[in-house]
UniProtKB/Swiss-Prot annotation:
Inducers of expression: By phenobarbital.
Effect of T339S: In isozyme PB2
Organism: Rattus norvegicus (Rat)
Protein name per UniProt: Cytochrome P450 2B1
Highest classification ranks of the organism: Eukaryota, Metazoa, Chordata, Craniata, Vertebrata
Membrane topology recorded in Swiss-Prot or TrEMBL: Peripheral membrane protein
GO annotation, biological process: epoxygenase P450 pathway; response to calcium ion; response to insulin; response to metal ion; response to sulfur dioxide; response to xenobiotic stimulus; xenobiotic metabolic process
Pfam family, one: p450
Length: 491
């Protein structure tokens, strides 16, 4: 008999056995949710619009805490600002584990600073925060690196002479170069072939991660991993990036000066050498490689995509861009570079950047957590290792905190006196112990890049503002803005 037929028969028999025996009751007292089918879980409740739409519909029926079965595994959803804060901040240690994203699990395997757990995660996070802080405050601060990159961008945009262009590539270049300078110790020219290949791989991978097929993969990863699909291309892309990172690491090994570490890699290699006699150390090659991949990927695509959304919104709402430019002219003028010290004197611009991050809602579902022990939460018992999804979109669009949550309105972050107003619901970087470790760098990038561009250029489109579409191209793990053309005209 053909192997394919045998496989199908085995699957059919297994499915029938599950139907006969029924779905086994999970240990613990889970929050309510739709009744799962054997093997399928809640697939039939999945909206074609994606997981986020599905979860929001289920929230209306089951409340702010509910359970969804992604295939056979139960996952608890947390919705609303107060619920997310109560879990990730109020019970921070209990909810500090990292869950699994099945489509990238074959590459990350719980290594690296983002997807590690337990003592491994704590050691890598402490090291990463300290190292990035040291290289951000050393001879060349992060501020200086961003200012330098912003001026490179200005020169590139001047070359366009106001002709329409897609900003995706240039925004990728500038954000990637900041993380490259901290992690690799160098920036790349915008024409460097290897650099261009890396940016292409990051862009394609982020798009695939946000696709509907990747969302379906979360339900049936144990089965679908044996078949062709987006998951295989994602693994192939990430492996190619790892191969390049491996080459960079070997170059660092060959030129390492213990008395003068140049960057994150050098500092990690020195720590590896220091702990080589410790058989239980977490500072080994695998954690280095996956940490570098994590930092590079998170530090490039998220900030560049936020900038893309930001300038699309400036085309849609030109009066906002004009008001930002007025504040830039008053505070900075046209003859010096914007600095981070300017931010406190520019509440409207700061509010606009906050609103761009809130409205663009870049990682709507949030990177999954898991509970580190049996945990009581709002009367429910979540067994150790239960996966938890903080639906960040439900906080960023929380009507209890934002008057018009589905509209772009910088007034959400301004008080009656025009000063910047903080909001508990503002969590684009998540919150709690797993908050994005690059938050500070990302905030600095957004402010300096945004103000430098609008200091030097006015932006326009061949489309009327009313015709500009803000609908995301993909909306899964990440929201991908639609492609668009923009004109940068020198002021």
């Amino acid at each position: 008999m053909e192997p394919t037929i045998l496989l199908l028969l085995a699957l059919l028999v297994g499915f029938l056995l599950l139907l006969v025996r029924g779905h086994p009751k999970s240990r613990g007292n889970f929050p309510p949710g739709p009744r799962p089918l054997p093997l399928l879980g809640n697939l039939l409740q999945l909206d074609r619009g994606g997981l986020l739409n599905s979860f929001m519909q289920l929230r209306e029926k089951y409340g702010d805490v509910f359970t969804v079965h992604l295939g056979p595994r139960p996952v608890v959803m947390l919705c609303g600002t107060d619920t997310i804060k109560e879990a990730l901040v109020g019970q921070a240690e209990d909810f500090s584990g990292r869950g699994t994203i099945a489509v990238i699990e074959p590459i990350f395997k719980e290594y690296g600073v983002i997807f590690a757990n337990g003592e491994r995660w704590k050691a890598l996070r402490r090291f990463s925060l300290a190292t990035m802080r040291d290289f951000g405050m050393g001879k060349r601060s992060v501020e200086e690196r961003i200012q330098e990159e912003a001026q490179c961008l200005v020169e590139e945009l001047r070359k366009s002479q106001g002709a329409p262009l897609d900003p995706t590539f240039l925004f990728q270049c500038i954000t990637a170069n900041i993380i490259c300078s901290i992690v690799f110790g160098e920036r790349f020219d915008y024409t460097d072939r290897q650099f261009l290949r890396l940016l292409e791989l990051f862009y394609r991978t982020f798009s695939l991660l946000s696709s509907f097929s990747s969302q379906v993969f979360e339900f049936f990863s144990g089965f679908l991993k044996y078949f062709p699909g987006a998951h295989r291309q994602i693994s192939k892309n990430l492996q190619e990036i790892l191969d390049y990172i491996g080459h960079i690491v070997e170059k660092h090994r060959a030129t390492l000066d213990p008395s003068a570490p140049r960057d994150f890699i050098d500092t990690y290699l020195l720590r590896m050498e220091k702990e080589k006699s410790n058989h239980h150390t977490e500072f080994h090659h695998e954690n280095l490689m996956i940490s570098l991949l994590s930092l590079f990927f998170a530090g490039t695509e998220t900030s560049s995509t936020t900038l893309r959304y930001g300038f699309l919104l400036m085309l849609k709402y030109p009066h906002v861009a004009e008001k930002v430019q007025k504040e830039i002219d008053q505070v900075i003028g046209s003859h010096r570079l914007p600095t981070l010290d300017d931010r406190s004197k520019m509440p409207y611009t700061d509010a606009v950047i906050h609103e761009i991050q809130r409205f663009s809602d870049l990682v709507p579902i949030g990177v999954p957590h898991r509970v580190t022990k049996d945990t009581m939460f709002r009367g429910y018992l979540l067994p150790k290792n239960t996966e938890v999804y903080p639906i960040l979109s439900s906080a960023l669009h929380d009507p209890q905190y934002f008057d018009h949550p589905d509209s772009f309105n910088p007034e959400h972050f301004l008080d009656a006196n025009g000063a910047l107003k903080k909001s508990e619901a503002f969590m684009p970087f998540s919150t709690g112990k797993r908050i994005c470790l690059g938050e500070g760098i990302a905030r600095n990038e957004l402010f300096l890049f945004f103000t430098t561009i609008l200091q030097n250029f006015s932006v326009s489109s061949h489309l009327a503002p009313k015709d500009i579409d803000l609908t995301p191209k993909e909306s899964g793990i990440g929201k991908i803005p639609p492609t668009y053309q923009i004109c940068f005209s020198a002021r």
